[in-house]
Amino acid sequence: MNKVVEKWDEILQIVKTEHDLSDVSFNTWLKPLTVYEVVANVVTIIVPSEQVGLNYISKKYKLPLQVTISEVTGMQNCAINFILPED
């Protein structure tokens, strides 16, 4: 199993804590995210909402997720792609 998948819940909790997210924000935007695949240093994450949600998450949480994934897993130069379930 990949380290990102293995530690996904921990990664999300760290982002929540370090960025002082409310439970509502966390449960709305981050908790529903799931790791689709990890290839080399690219993490593909499924956003189970419409395009608006994908755009918002990409703008607001992409960098915090990249930094936290790198810190927790040791993955250098981590890149993130967000996709919708139908992609």
Where are these regions (language model features)?
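Intrinsically disordered, low-complexity basic tails and flexible linkers associated
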Residues: M1-D87
